């Protein structure tokens, strides 16, 4: 059995000097350890409460590579279970979502209530004449399930910090999407799913820390949608905001703490997002006053940038895309993309949000394709022995971290930096090399204290 010491995790990651060895993206032993110590110990996004509003409503998803079913209970609470029959490990729920009074295994017919209890075993008196203790063979329940403003998270590790503590200061940035209007948010439409042939850490890192790539990877989109020489805007539709935000922003920052990351520009108008269409742009202008009252000016104006909650929940504020990077081996990730909107928005605006999110960041989105091509090409190159063992530079903004005095929380830097990436890989290494959550927290705290010296 491979142990963390065998893998020399801290020799692969040197966050103090900004170095990473790309073998972390290819090694199957590292990947198996990730499934155990990251996806088995961290809070993972499961679903949005709007997807399971009534008792018996369920949504099927994954925690790492473990299939789980999330179910609204009769009392309104939410439970999640391993989607696996306790008889021969068969899946008990196949539909992506729906409403059910029970989950029945198609193999031998064992049936479970929505509370996870085993309620029926076919031919039980004949098959188990000695008796069967059904109370012992209910579905394996995810022991920790909590919600944050509509987002449902699960955790297998009962010793982990609670969800509120786990989120920490990233919650302030997350509220900029979840708390703009009275009534909160909801998921619009279904889930778009596709597979990218790359390690899950590539997209997670980019959404945590990388605004820098947009100037180059998305150059063609910026040229099409960007400002004309005469200063007027090109438009995809009525009200389309087109000028690149990094040209117009008065300030910008990146947040990186506890493995989480966020970055955004301080804009001066409530529709400063090049990737949204006219109806969405107008909606942001019309609802700005309410958002400012609830969030303050900085977050109310924040409609561009990047975000990731460690390990795999990412979102983009202005384009209303929320996505999860489900790992599928060391060289593959399955993307699940949701459109998240204010619940109070009109049906017309919600449809416009969905169109904008799909156009830019759907599986064939004009920005999504740029990103996917980058990640896939890197993964191909890392098949080479020398390539996957040659250290990479992670020095951008090294030593420039600070805490702001304007009420914006956490460890920050200028937006074009890798503060959040270094923090993400530090938390990653701490989790892989630690036996307990307390050890993880102590190591991360020591790293962050050193960063702020």
Curated annotation (Swiss-Prot):
Pfam families: Rieske, Ring_hydroxyl_A
PROSITE patterns tied to this protein: RIESKE, RING_HYDROXYL_ALPHA
EC number: 1.14.12.19
SUPFAM superfamilies named in the record: Bet v1-like, ISP domain
Claim: Transmembrane helix is one of the keywords in the record: no
The Rieske domain, residue ranges: 44-142
InterPro entries reported for this sequence: 3PPDioc_HcaE (IPR054883), HcaE (IPR020875), RHO_NdoB-like_C (IPR043266), Rieske_2Fe-2S (IPR017941), Rieske_2Fe-2S_sf (IPR036922), Ring-hydroxy_dOase_2Fe2S_BS (IPR015881), Ring_hydroxy_dOase_asu_C_dom (IPR015879), Rng_hydr_dOase-A (IPR001663)
Recorded catalytic activity of this chain's protein: 3-phenylpropanoate + NADH + O2 + H(+) = 3-(cis-5,6-dihydroxycyclohexa-1,3-dien-1-yl)propanoate + NAD(+); (E)-cinnamate + NADH + O2 + H(+) = (2E)-3-(cis-5,6-dihydroxycyclohexa-1,3-dien-1-yl)prop-2-enoate + NAD(+)
Cofactor(s) needed by this chain: Fe cation; [2Fe-2S] cluster
UniProt pathway: Aromatic compound metabolism; 3-phenylpropanoate degradation
Subunit record text: This dioxygenase system consists of four proteins: the two subunits of the hydroxylase component (HcaE and HcaF), a ferredoxin (HcaC) and a ferredoxin reductase (HcaD).
Similarity-based family: Belongs to the bacterial ring-hydroxylating dioxygenase alpha subunit family.
Chain's role: Part of the multicomponent 3-phenylpropionate dioxygenase. Converts 3-phenylpropionic acid (PP) and cinnamic acid (CI) into 3-phenylpropionate-dihydrodiol (PP-dihydrodiol) and cinnamic acid-dihydrodiol (CI-dihydrodiol), respectively.
NCBIfam families: 3PPDioc_HcaE
Protein name per the record: 3-phenylpropionate/cinnamic acid dioxygenase subunit alpha
Organism: Shigella flexneri
Taxonomy of the source species: Bacteria, Pseudomonadati, Pseudomonadota, Gammaproteobacteria, Enterobacterales
